[in-house]
Amino acid sequence: MKWVTFLLLLFVSGSAFSRGVFRREAHKSEIAHRYNDLGEQHFKGLVLIAFSQYLQKCSYDEHAKLVQEVTDFAKTCVADESAANCDKSLHTLFGDKLCAIPNLRENYGELADCCTKQEPERNECFLQHKDDNPSLPPFERPEAEAMCTSFKENPTTFMGHYLHEVARRHPYFYAPELLYYAEQYNEILTQCCAEADKESCLTPKLDGVKEKALVSSVRQRMKCSSMQKFGERAFKAWAVARLSQTFPNADFAEITKLATDLTKVNKECCHGDLLECADDRAELAKYMCENQATISSKLQTCCDKPLLKKAHCLSEVEHDTMPADLPAIAADFVEDQEVCKNYAEAKDVFLGTFLYEYSRRHPDYSVSLLLRLAKKYEATLEKCCAEANPPACYGTVLAEFQPLVEEPKNLVKTNCDLYEKLGEYGFQNAILVRYTQKAPQVSTPTLVEAARNLGRVGTKCCTLPEDQRLPCVEDYLSAILNRVCLLHEKTPVSEHVTKCCSGSLVERRPCFSALTVDETYVPKEFKAETFTFHSDICTLPEKEKQIKKQTALAELVKHKPKATAEQLKTVMDDFAQFLDTCCKAADKDTCFSTEGPNLVTRCKDALA
């Protein structure tokens, strides 16, 4: 489509980058309106998530009491929208509830200062006090029998506990998706608690839901980080790229409408406006299902599902078939003699169309890569359109994309080859060594958590078809590295990490990949107690055993950052043999106390 057609389209429809599908009338009582739209069950679930994400230390019972009070008040407003306080904004109503909590300052410290502010500053203040790494004990899943007994006694309370425990550990979890995962959890329990062998039915199914939910959480946190640091424009660019890949037959106007509304929905959830977010997400799903003809041929299966499953399905729907007759992208964006004129007349829209056209042709690229290419294209036009002969200057821009494309492709090949050779645990260890060398000042628990999460990319992505690997690997790594940055921001210790985390979100992964050994680091002193183990390690679950061994590995690298792969392998093999021998010994304690010091000596000698 020629650029002039885009301009006509904009002229007729207003700004294609500013209009969405939501067309809501103002309501006398916002809370009554949301209660009516969402229904009591979803309303109560969302209010519980909201309170749990703001007040992460409160017990379930405290939150359940607040939820019931808010629900009762909403019902009053449904009955009479002109009743006292029903016209107040949701922020005001929720904020007043939070500020009325007994002992707020004793339990939450500076968060209590937010209560001296007026809206919207008060809500912004609450958001700033959300803790991405709250000091809560790990969530332990009860035994199958105990879980089924609790579930059968009171399914509503059981699922309420699930929402509360997940939400307070993940204060930016996408609330409508958390309702979806709770629904999945409920269905699994309903099915498995009727089985004779509850444990073997529940464990794999609940593990699967947990894994998907954790990935959903880190992805949503990255979206909120993008919104918080770079504003709506950056998020909308992400949405345009992602939607264009998924719906390559939709026209630019349709994609920008969807991107505008997706941006609104995510902004609401990231800002804690969970009732609006869930309501608008349902509206967006409804719009997509009513307009399948102009969006995608792949939506019908999703649209046949009930609300929560429908919205989840639409967010993960497979890519539509790419149009067969797409012209070369160079025609409008390189060869056209009026590129600079078109760019100057409407920069954001011109760049938006470039991103749309490039993305719909490349479902095999990651969104991060597509945004880096758009950024390169923008920088080229900024430079070239100021020169005497712009076409000669920007004529090679598409060829200049090649190094940017090759870098992540090489990353995927190298890492997937390594994963196939080592398996997940060995691959995690390789990443742990790599990242400890890059940022040895970062705390060992943070490095181990990051390496374990980054290492899962192999299992998650390397078994996929070739054309799906790159988007899977890079977009997953970007989300995990965002968490590394969030944790590092609280207690910055590494200039390397600060440098990568301070720049653009889409440049972070390449920045981390390019880091080398930190030459400024003064190695840690070798401490024997760091490598001293006791017989209790023998009875730990496999995951916790791995974490203990990976903690020792990170400490070894901090002691000897330039240790060779062979040296580290020798030490870790010796360590594994030591554990195997002592855990099989008749007198484990004696074995650990006598062989442990010998292991420490051998470690020091191997790394000398």
Curated annotation (Swiss-Prot):
Q: Which SUPFAM superfamilies match?
A: Serum albumin-like (SSF48552)
Q: Which GO terms describe its biological process?
A: cellular response to calcium ion starvation; cellular response to starvation; negative regulation of mitochondrial depolarization
Main localization of the protein described in the UniProt heading: secreted
What are the record's GO terms for cellular component?
cytoplasm; endoplasmic reticulum; extracellular exosome; extracellular region; extracellular space; Golgi apparatus; myelin sheath; protein-containing complex
Q: N6-methyllysine (modified residue): where?
A: K558
* Transmembrane feature ranges: none
Where would I find the Albumin domain in this sequence? 19-211, 212-403, 404-601
Q: Where does Ca(2+) 2 bind?
A: D37, D279
Give the subcellular location. Answer: Secreted
Q: Which InterPro entries match?
A: ALB/AFP/VDB, Serum_albumin-like, Serum_albumin/AFP/Afamin, Serum_albumin_CS, Serum_albumin_N
Tell me the residues on which Phosphoserine occurs.
S29, S82, S89, S297, S443, S513
- State the disulfide connectivity: C77-C86, C99-C115, C114-C125, C148-C193, C192-C201, C224-C270, C269-C277, C289-C303, C302-C313, C340-C385, C384-C393, C416-C462, C461-C472, C485-C501, C500-C511, C538-C583, C582-C591
Maturation and modification: Phosphorylated by FAM20C in the extracellular medium.
* Gene Ontology MF term list: DNA binding; enterobactin binding; exogenous protein binding; fatty acid binding; identical protein binding; metal ion binding; oxygen binding; protein-folding chaperone binding
Q: Recite the UniProt keywords alphabetically.
A: Calcium, Cleavage on pair of basic residues, Copper, Disulfide bond, Lipid-binding, Metal-binding, Methylation, Phosphoprotein, Repeat, Secreted, Signal, Zinc
* Residues of the signal peptide: 1-18
Q: Does the keyword Zinc apply?
A: yes
What domain of life is recorded for the organism? Eukaryota
Q: Which Pfam family, just one, is annotated for this protein?
A: Serum_albumin
Q: Which residues does this entry mark as bearing N6-succinyllysine?
A: K229, K460, K543, K588
Q: Where does Ca(2+) 1 bind?
A: E30, E268, D273, E276
- Briefly state the protein's biological role: Binds water, Ca(2+), Na(+), K(+), fatty acids, hormones, bilirubin and drugs. Its main function is the regulation of the colloidal osmotic pressure of blood. Major zinc transporter in plasma, typically binds about 80% of all plasma zinc. Major calcium and magnesium transporter in plasma, binds approximately 45% of circulating calcium and magnesium in plasma. Potentially has more than two calcium-binding sites and might additionally bind calcium in a non-specific manner.
Protein known as: Albumin
